[in-house]
């Protein structure tokens, strides 16, 4: 059976190799880094598991959980977040305010909790109540998340309830992000009920929440990519090197890695869209142009570990979110010792700062020491922390977060339609139809199945 070339050894590439191996289809992974796993990386320091990339995945998307049931050693690894302490705070006027319990994005699932909350004003609460009068609406074109929320509620709900949550996932601005691609569930509510509040109420009635919202792995998220590497990529040939170009040669695809030329019947590109665009620029310019049009945001992660007794502030909750208007360095902070207590040694507190969007761009040339100092200043102002951390870890992820801007779904549809003209060329990763790890695994599974069906 013809070998498949997989470009990129992150979770998408490793998952593709694994699913291909289930069909006995040989593959070769080309990875320029010294390690596989991509953005998934677990640092083990002084008895603590510190995630350099994603720390969990959403429980409502089953692809990763299903995968753990078949990978050796992972069946008993799944752990849930400590949802008994699932309190999230939002910074308003320089102070941490508890977000109302039961929120589903910007929509309240618990009216009493909303009434008691000081995150939004009485005027915003009235706007949320008025929204229940909306009638079903079928839009003819995509709109931004900002437009959707302001039309249904108001600017305050957008600033303090919506944007901070989205920023932690997409690292982008609401006025640019696509409502259809980022909030498809809510667009569905608008079409069916008109009111987003009515849609959430009905969903909570039909499918009450059960279990943890976030899932992870007991020994760290890197356990997933390590297991994939051993189970699937372990049967694949791994080539270390940087891909220069990809081009079609009759029914074959040629991949130049340094001075070497590799040939295969199928190529799966698992790199960021802008990297894929460079690889295809000379040979498939129409596809390359669509890929190059997908913008990206950068991220910086700073993990600080403190002596809990010296912290001087409670970490009873999952952490806090910082709206843009508060003008802080960090966009979000996770209190890891509460969200996943087993990851942090007893007596310690771990604060995970997330810097994204324009702030990450502004700090692109800043040193690690300068950024750490800015994060500490935010903690001092918001939490009153004056103690020095026992240690910290620091990671930059430049151009790592694809932005699903207005019109993204149409662009992806056009992109995939063009791919049908190039048999054997596939795109995997988080730039197309889902940014989470489960989305990457699902897409890898579907590509492997398609290659198998075409090879029969």
Which sequence ranges carry the predicted segments?
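Glycine-rich FAD pyrophosphate-binding loop
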Residues: 21-45
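Conserved Rossmann-like nucleotide-cofactor binding loop
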Residues: 12, 35, 274
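Short, well-ordered coil/turn residues at beta-beta hairpins
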Residues: 60, 151-152, 270-271
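Mid-domain catalytic core of redox enzymes
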Residues: 241-351, 356-369, 381-382, 417
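Dinucleotide-binding Rossmann-like beta1-alpha1 core, especially the glycine-rich loop
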Residues: 46-136
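Conserved flavin/dinucleotide-binding core of flavoenzymes
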Residues: 100-102, 315-317, 332-456
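N-terminal Rossmann-like FAD-binding beta1-loop-alpha1 element of flavoenzymes
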Residues: 2-29
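Active-site/ligand-binding neighborhood in enzyme catalytic cores
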Residues: 126-245
């Amino acid at each position: 059976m013809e070998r498949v070339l997989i470009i990129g050894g992150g979770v998408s590439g490793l998952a593709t190799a694994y699913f291909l191996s289930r069909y006995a289809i040989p593959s070769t992974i080309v990875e320029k880094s010294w390690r596989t796993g991509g953005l998934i990386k677990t640092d083990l320091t002084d008895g603590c598991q510190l995630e350099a990339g994603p720390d969990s995945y959403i429980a409502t998307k089953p692809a990763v959980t299903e995968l753990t049931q078949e990978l050796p050693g992972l069946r008993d690894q799944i752990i849930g977040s400590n949802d008994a302490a699932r309190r999230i705070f939002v910074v308003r006027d320089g102070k941490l305010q508890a977000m109302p319990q039961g929120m589903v994005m910007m929509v309240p699932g618990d009216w009493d909790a909303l009434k008691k909350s000081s995150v939004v004003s009485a005027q915003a609460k009235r706007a949320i109540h008025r929204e229940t009068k909306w009638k079903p609406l079928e839009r003819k074109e995509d709109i931004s998340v900002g437009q959707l929320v302001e039309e249904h509620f108001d600017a305050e709900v957008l600033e303090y309830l919506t944007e901070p949550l989205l920023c932690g996932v997409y690292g982008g601005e609401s006025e640019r992000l696509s409502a259809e691609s980022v909030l498809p569930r809510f667009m569905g509510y608008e079409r069916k009920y008109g009111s987003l509040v009515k849609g959430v109420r009905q969903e909570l009635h039909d499918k009450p929440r059960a279990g943890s919202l976030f899932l992870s792995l007991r020994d760290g998220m890197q356990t997933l990519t390590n297991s994939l590497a051993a189970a699937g990529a372990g049967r694949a040939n791994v080539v270390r090197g940087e891909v220069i170009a990809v081009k079609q040669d009759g029914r074959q695809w040629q991949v130049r890695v340094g001075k070497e030329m590799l040939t295969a019947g199928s190529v799966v590109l698992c790199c960021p869209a802008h990297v894929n665009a460079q690889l295809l620029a000379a040979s498939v310019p129409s596809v390359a142009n669509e890929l190059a049009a997908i913008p990206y945001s950068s991220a910086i992660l700073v993990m600080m570990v403190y002596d809990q007794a010296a912290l001087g502030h409670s970490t009873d909750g999952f952490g806090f979110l910082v709206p843009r208007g508060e003008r802080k360095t960090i966009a979000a902070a996770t209190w890891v010792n509460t969200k996943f207590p087993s990851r942090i040694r007893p007596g310690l507190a771990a604060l995970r700062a997330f810097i994204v969007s324009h702030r990450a761009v502004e700090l692109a040339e800043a040193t690690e020491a300068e950024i750490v100092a800015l994060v500490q200043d935010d903690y001092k102002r918001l939490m009153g922390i004056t103690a020095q951390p026992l240690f910290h870890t620091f990671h930059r992820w430049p151009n790592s977060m694809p932005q699903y801007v207005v019109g993204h779904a149409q662009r992806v549809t056009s992109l995939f339609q063009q791919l049908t003209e190039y048999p054997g060329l596939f795109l995997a990763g988080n730039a197309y139809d889902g940014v989470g790890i489960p989305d990457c695994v699902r897409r890898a599974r579907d590509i492997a199945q398609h290659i198998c069906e075409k090879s029969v």
